[in-house]
Amino acid sequence: SLRTQIHIYGDNFGTDPSKIHITIGGQYTTTIGCTNTEIYCIVPPKAFDGNIKIKIESADGKNSPIEYEFEKKFNYTLQPSVSTLVGSEDENGNSSDVDGNFEKARFGNPQWLLMDTFGIEKCLIINGQGGPIRRINLEAKEVSTLLTNGQGGFRNMQFMSFDATGDTLFVSDDHGSSSKDNREIAYILRSEEFRKAHPYVYDRTGYNNVYCALNKSLYYNTYWKGGLQKAVHDPTTGGKKGVELFGVYENSDSGTFMCIHPDGRFMYITGRNCILVSQYNKVTNEFQKPTTFAGREGEAGYSPSPGPSARFQEPYQGTFVKNEEYIKNPRPDGNIYDYYICDRGNHCIFKITPDGNVSLFAGRGSVSSDNKVSGNIDGELKTEARFDNPCGIAYDEETQTFYIADRENHSIRTISIE
């Protein structure tokens, strides 16, 4: 998306842009062009308000620079927008996993994102069904492969989660069997550069796992009734074994996606067109059988509405984000987080409040151009931007940036104030 332009009019500016230095709201901006009577620049990132200051050097460098500060303060409300960070397709819309800098890197089927702020450099960890696990270094602007499906001994690598320290990644495996003799969860270590898979628990096939810091336990799912499993100590082997806590569905077999609230108070369980909530019991230190929070099991559609009236197509990964309004005006339950979730089938990102009110956050824009809601368009969140099967989402609280794994666009998109 284009940045906002600023034109400054006056006299005796000169014609050398390199001699003109401008700050807007304390942020430096580049002088794009100038004539003797006009300066053209753009609003720099994070320039929300403040004074506009100009310093103009003399043409020969012999005289002192002229400095001027506008009396009227600059006040500009920046709007968040969708952009493409990295990833591209060929002329036929195809792509594959290619490592390299952000200009060269490509993605085959990006689906699951984890924000990695535990290491020296800020990164994203990404994978898709069948792997590989890759690192997106946001500081070096490079993409590298950590572990492939074959290198890790996976039948069909699925999705992953960090432990509380960020030193361990747990990775699920859809091995396609009801036998408990197969490795279901592997773990990989930062100390080994996440390049070697070790067995963590053997169980029936599954798709997703999540670590709970409150009781230092790993939870994962299975296909059968979407059963929630817990990895517990096995005194016989000295390792871990799976214990089923409950079936998520009464009459259906299907996988789920899970996300635990930052303070551990509950877990959202997503699948079959709805989002369920499992409360954490602090007396038993265990999650309880879930109830429906938003949407209705087995009823697909598109409807940003309150609670059970909402309709999802294929809700996928979600992430919790602090809402400053809840901090200024505390809720009775003390919850300060909204939930943002990708809906793969509806090609959008939904926002869900703690009360279950579902609203469109981003995507499904530019509809008047071709009456489609999927596509690859950057721009304003709801009127312009489009996604194509967005699956993964992560949030960087420091920069207030969302990262989206846009599967069929084979790219990583961002939602931020540029």
Located regions from the model:
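Short loop/turn segments immediately following beta-strands, especially the blade-tip
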Residues: 187-193, 231-238, 277-285, 415-418
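Blade-level signature of beta-propeller repeat domains, shared across WD40, Kelch, NHL, RCC1
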Residues: 389-418
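Gly/Pro-rich loop segments of beta-rich domains
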Residues: 8, 77-109, 140-158, 174-176, ...
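Ser/Thr/Pro-rich low-complexity tracts
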Residues: 1-83, 236, 282-285
